[in-house]
Amino acid sequence: MIGRTHHCGQLSEEQVNERVQLKGWVQRRRDLGQVIFVDLRDRSGVVQLVFNSDISQEALETAEKVRNEYVLDVEGVVLKRDPSTVNDKIATGTIEVHVERLTILNKAKSLPFQIEANTDASEDIRLKYRYLDLRRPDMQETMKLRHQTTKLIRDFLDGQEFFEIETPMLTKSTPEGARDYLVPSRVHHGEFYALPQSPQIFKQLLMVSGFERYYQIVRCFRDEDLRADRQPEFTQIDIETSFMDKEDLLTMTENMMAKIMKEVKGLDVALPFPRMTYDDAMNRYGSDKPDTRFEMELIELSDIVKDSDFKVFSSAIKSGGIVKGLNLKGGAGSLSRKEIDGLAEFVKPYGAKGLAWLKVEEGELKGPIAKFFAGETGAELQQAMGAEDGDLLFFAADKKEVVFDSLGALRLKLGKDFNLIDESKFNFLWVVDFPLVEYDEEAKRFVALHHPFTSPKQEDLTKLETDPASVRADAYDLVLNGYELGGGSQRIYQRPVQEKMFAALGFTEEAAQKEFGFLLEAFEYGTPPHGGIALGLDRLVMLLAGRLNLRDTIAFPKTASASCLLTEAPGEVSLEQLLDLNLSIIGHKPDKVNV
């Protein structure tokens, strides 16, 4: 088959009077009787084709059979359009191709939805016909942006003398993390591989191996509950270094992100990125990934209201809880009582039992609980919250975790609902000094906040055995516009420290040896100090492209129930396949078994 001379979107007035050969899909066809216009599309863009009997009767007759999404091969001459027909909406709008030969390479059935940037098709239909959805120009642009971003990352890290090294997809299932996707072994009956949640252990072993600078753009798998910014399989920009100072690693990461922002978005970002401690982020924003594009911070009120007659507040404080507030500036006249009640329902899934509120009118507090805050306490409350006439004040009183979660979520909702967020901004932020561990009430033990290989801060190391809850991690998360782009840490690289960490997490010596003995042994062969970071490529592309969820940044994503509507995965397997694996499904005895 003869190739093409140009791509559709690359034609311009420079090619006027040139003979060209194009291939692509029919975006639109307009039949005016003696002349037919066809918009031909390929991944570069669209160009208008013209068919009439003066050019070629045969091509005109063939064009009469053409329909949307037919695949065409055409030859013709590029000519300038009549000034009255110039189309400023497309890059090729000043020219058209007068077609002398037309070959229909393939036909298309009636489409389930139109191949256009704006579609009213449901997401389920789009995912079922993903190969059509990916033809839409906005999806093509997103995939192109993803490619550009990936290439920039590779070029940048190559310039920093990093090696791209692959790590295994079939590995060992280990505790401390989300649920693994398990792969049964046919050779080793009753035993399973796990798909990697991250290459964490292997990249540390590569540091033991002496490679010093490693990266990988790697697929990872986690069997966890999904949401708009999560997928069961996702892509991670994985980086690990030996002998690199933490500050140098953070600076290098900032420079990489600045390069991406400049090349992809044309934006200059201020360096270095701001830093905020975990405690500061939680106290001010109710989140360890705060969106700093708008203000409205949480305000500490416990000392002011601890002796209040309003028992919801005073009782919470006496029980070891806290009281915090939010000030929606000018919000008093914007929300009805019904809408405020709706916000009280909104915070309940975050553990809040309710949402107290007050309005400020003519310098006085008004609302259901105003009688409890007359006089000096009310004045102190207004002063602390910077309250002015027309403001709407919200309050939460409970355990600090509940207050943080509920008011943090409410802050984001109000920011979006009242258009307080500057969507043109890209606000990067490092969050540092995380707790090393947190107590799991269900498991009745400490669990790692990040992972069990994170190093404690050196000044807290002596407390690891006696007071693990007070130990800070030498860890850092990179946040962009309220999303965690990724995180990293300095790693434990000495066996005694790693053993203490496992003990703090409730591992017996035997359990630690069984699960991680190979790593502990590696630490006895000259392991260098090392650290790294992992950034979510899907999430980064989502933010760069201005998409609303990760599915729009992945060519073939899964649904919220972790299924593929295109291939209908997960699907059935035969009884023979199960027998090969020495497996049976409890309660099922058909020829095909749904797994």
Curated annotation (Swiss-Prot):
Coiled-coil intervals in this record?
none
Renumbered residue ranges of the record's region Aspartate:
200-203
Q: What class of enzyme is it?
A: ligase
Which reactions fall under this protein's catalytic activity? tRNA(Asp) + L-aspartate + ATP = L-aspartyl-tRNA(Asp) + AMP + diphosphate
Q: Which residues bind L-aspartate?
A: E176, R222, H450, R491
Do you know which SUPFAM superfamilies this protein is assigned to?
A: Class II aaRS and biotin synthetases, GAD domain-like, Nucleic acid-binding proteins
The protein's GO terms of the molecular function aspect are: aspartate-tRNA ligase activity; ATP binding; catalytic activity, acting on a protein; nucleic acid binding; transferase activity
User: In this UniProt entry, which cysteines form S-S bonds?
Assistant: none
Which InterPro entries does the record associate with it?
Answer: Aa-tRNA-synt_II, aa-tRNA-synth_II, aa-tRNA-synth_II/BPL/LPL, Asp-tRNA-ligase_1, Asp-tRNA-ligase_1_N, Asp/Asn-tRNA-synth_IIb, AspRS_core, GAD-like_sf
Q: What does this protein do?
A: Catalyzes the attachment of L-aspartate to tRNA(Asp) in a two-step reaction: L-aspartate is first activated by ATP to form Asp-AMP and then transferred to the acceptor end of tRNA(Asp).
HAMAP family per UniProt = Asp_tRNA_synth_type1
Which family does this protein fall into?
Belongs to the class-II aminoacyl-tRNA synthetase family. Type 1 subfamily.
NCBIfam families linked: aspS_bact, PRK00476.1
Assembly and oligomerization: Homodimer.
Name used for this protein in its record: Aspartate--tRNA ligase
Q: Which organism is it from?
A: Halalkalibacterium halodurans (strain ATCC BAA-125 / DSM 18197 / FERM 7344 / JCM 9153 / C-125) (Bacillus halodurans)
